[in-house]
Structures are given as C-alpha cells and as structure tokens.
C-alpha cells in the first residue's frame, strides 16, 4: 500500500516522499513504533539529499522508499551482488548494515570527477574493490551514519561505527543472526540514473522494551515509592515514575589527604565517566555518563542483578 507523506523542500525543489511498507510489518512493530520509524526516515531523506547534492555538486531526488523485514533491497530477486558495509551500534553491541546498488559508487565517482553519471550504464560489480571505491565508500558511509544518527536523536541516541566493507552475493544466506532487521530502502535519481541504498537496523532499536522488575510497597496505590523485587515483571503498566540516583564509581583518597582537605581543594576522580545507577538506594546497573545535545545521558553497560537481564 502506497502512502504520500507530504511535501518537503530541498534545494528549491519540492518532492513527495512516497513509501511502501511490508504488509506484515505490524507483526513486528506497533503503530507508535512505525510512526517513529517513518519520522526518522523522513528526516534522514531530507538530510542525506542535501549532503549528497553538496558532495557531488548535482541535484539528487528521491524516487521512493520502502520498509521491510530482513531484506537487502526492495526486491532482492533483481540483484546478484551488492556493496555491503558492516556497522556496529556501540551503545547496544549490535550490528547494522548499509547496502549500495551495484552502480552506486561508480555513479558517485563519475560525478566527483566531472562526469554526469550517464556514462555508467552497467549494473554488475567487479570482484575486487578499487582503492578509489574504498575511499569514496567510507566517505559516503560517514555521511549516512551522521545523517541517520542525527535523525534519530529526537527519539533515542545511537552511536554507530564503521566496521568493514565488501561485496556480498545475494544468493547466499546473509542473515545468520537471530536478530530481526528493519530494511529501510531508499531509491534515488541522479541525472536520470537510478541508484539505491539500504539501511538495516535491528528491530530492537525501534521496539520500546523499557520493562523493569518492580513491586509496590502498597499495591493499591500507584506511587513513586517502589522497591525492587525478584519475580514481578511489569509489562503493560505506564506512567510509573522511579526515583533514579546516579553515583560516580568510587574513587579513593588517603586518610592523610582527607584529614587535610580544605575548601577549594581538587580531588581526582579515576574514571568520571563510569557511574552506578540506583533506584531507591539499591544499585541497579553500571553505565557510562556522557553529555549529548546539552543533556546528560547514561549508557547502560551491565545489570547488577541477574533477574534484571533482558528476557
């Protein structure tokens, strides 16, 4: 089913964002999660078109985009090989991928060297990647990562790192992992030439699984006062507030130093980025503290209670 997502303006040209989503996508994402994904993709399209247009000094237009599950492209049957970039989502220790159409890099390279891309008509891929392709690929992947992470920041923070670049055969099974991936496929038009890229992210990135194991001191009153218990798994409750305290990982000073402390003295903290997060004075997990977009953010690294592990 095709949906028109409204009009946006880029480089004084108006275009419609047309997208098609897999019919069974609602088996994996609820309506709120799908809306979140649509907003992220819309922002990404606007950002990446501006970046690509500036990079190759030429107009680029979106044809359409699709959202599917565990696919490389909009229609995998049309291709034998793709350029593949393996990525790592550092905050969650999960993999992600970016795939390019067989003509993607050659068209960009032709534009960058003064051509119009129309000399590139083949849709196959050479077995070996050239040095120029490596350099241009890494530059473009950097653009995509920055644009996608920036598009996500209104909903969540992700830190994506480049891992590897190679060529894959689509007739071989690639998804060996148990993770489900959302395939965000974007078809573009450069000077009449169709190219595409696909961004694959784990479904768990979009899923809102912020479930906690808690119990109430008074089960008849919804209160902020909560204590942690081992066997009560909250799944469908909302509007629950927990008192969260963030503490620095303990550092140590000598008794002599302590006895001689004066106002204005400086105390060295061994690792100020490391913190312990507590609820009702009970340590819950270890994390890293960072400042992002003028906000304090804690990255969860390790639960301190085995029953709090994700299920």
UniProtKB/Swiss-Prot annotation:
It is found in: Cell inner membrane; Bacterial flagellum basal body. It comes from the Bacteria. GO terms for molecular function: cytoskeletal motor activity. Its main location: membrane. Keywords: Bacterial flagellum, Cell inner membrane, Cell membrane, Chemotaxis, Flagellar rotation, Membrane. One of its GO terms (biological process) is positive chemotaxis. InterPro entries: CheC-like_sf, Flag_FliM, FliN-like_C, SpoA-like_sf. The keyword Cell inner membrane applies. It is a peripheral membrane protein. One of its GO terms (cellular component) is plasma membrane. FliM is one of three proteins (FliG, FliN, FliM) that forms the rotor-mounted switch complex (C ring), located at the base of the basal body. This complex interacts with the CheY and CheZ chemotaxis proteins, in addition to contacting components of the motor that determine the direction of flagellar rotation. Belongs to the FliM family. This is Flagellar motor switch protein FliM. The lineage of its organism: Bacteria, Pseudomonadati, Pseudomonadota, Gammaproteobacteria, Enterobacterales.
């Amino acid at each position: 089913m095709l949906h028109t997502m409204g009009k946006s303006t880029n480089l004084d040209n108006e275009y419609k964002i047309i997208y098609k989503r897999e019919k069974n996508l609602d088996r994996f994402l609820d309506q709120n999660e799908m809306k979140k994904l649509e907003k992220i993709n819309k922002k990404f399209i606007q950002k990446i078109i501006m970046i690509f247009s500036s990079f190759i000094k030429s107009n680029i237009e979106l044809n359409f985009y699709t959202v599917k599950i565990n696919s490389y492209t909009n229609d995998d049957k049309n291709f034998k090989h793709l350029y593949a970039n393996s990525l790592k989502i550092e905050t969650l220790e999960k993999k992600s991928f970016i795939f390019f159409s067989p003509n993607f890099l050659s068209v960009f390279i032709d534009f960058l060297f003064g051509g119009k891309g129309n000399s590139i008509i083949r849709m196959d891929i050479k077995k070996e990647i050239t040095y120029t392709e490596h350099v241009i690929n890494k530059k473009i992947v950097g653009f995509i990562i920055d644009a996608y992470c920036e598009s996500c920041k209104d909903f969540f923070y992700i830190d994506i790192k480049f891992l590897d670049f190679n060529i894959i055969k689509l007739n071989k099974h690639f998804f060996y992992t148990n993770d489900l991936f959302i395939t965000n496929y974007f078809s573009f038009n450069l000077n009449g030439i169709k190219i595409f890229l696909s961004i694959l992210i784990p479904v768990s990135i979009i899923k809102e699984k912020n479930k906690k194991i808690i119990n109430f001191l008074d089960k008849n009153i919804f209160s902020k006062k909560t204590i942690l218990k081992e066997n009560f798994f909250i799944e469908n409750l909302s509007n629950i507030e927990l008192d969260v305290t963030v503490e620095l990982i303990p550092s140590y000073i000598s008794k002599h130093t302590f006895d001689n402390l004066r106002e204005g003295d400086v105390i060295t903290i061994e690792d100020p980025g490391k913190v312990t997060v507590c609820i009702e004075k009970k340590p819950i997990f270890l994390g890293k503290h960072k400042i992002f977009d003028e906000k304090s953010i804690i990255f969860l690294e390790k639960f301190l209670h085995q029953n709090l592990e994700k299920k």
